[in-house]
Amino acid sequence: NGNPITNHFLSFDRSHYEIEKYEPNPDATEWVIDMIITDNEAVSVHSALGQLGYDVSITRQTHWEISVEDERESILQKIDATGELYNSNKEFINEITTADNTASFLVRQKDDMRSRAKFESLTERFEIEKISELKRGVIWNVTVNSGNLDAILKHILNTHILFNPL
């Protein structure tokens, strides 16, 4: 039939990840953004985990860490007025979700291209000076409705549905 066939095993070792306790930069301002409208990405993750048999609730928040050199309030007001970091028609600044049986995971990209682009836009297009650093991440809030919290969280993290370990 012309198709070469070999008899061997394939193996793949996933890279291991470490969960670190998040320590906010004391010199930075955190903005936690919630959505007014339905978050389709969180709904999809919730649905996929439900199909895997997990009785959990999922919400997602966007996390911005904004470092400025001085004039913090003035700079933050300018950033807010641009609408670059969130769309005030669909989103609003809130607090990190806290609830019983809930764990929150801040996930950041290794190459944070989105925050780099927003930083350039704020400093060049909007000419806001004194922004020293901008970091973006996603906070996944996982509420375990039934079962052992730690065991279920470990299983969910091992699915890599909340982040790409590579």
Model-found features: residue ranges?
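Non-catalytic terminal accessory/regulatory regions of metabolic enzymes
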Residues: 1-166
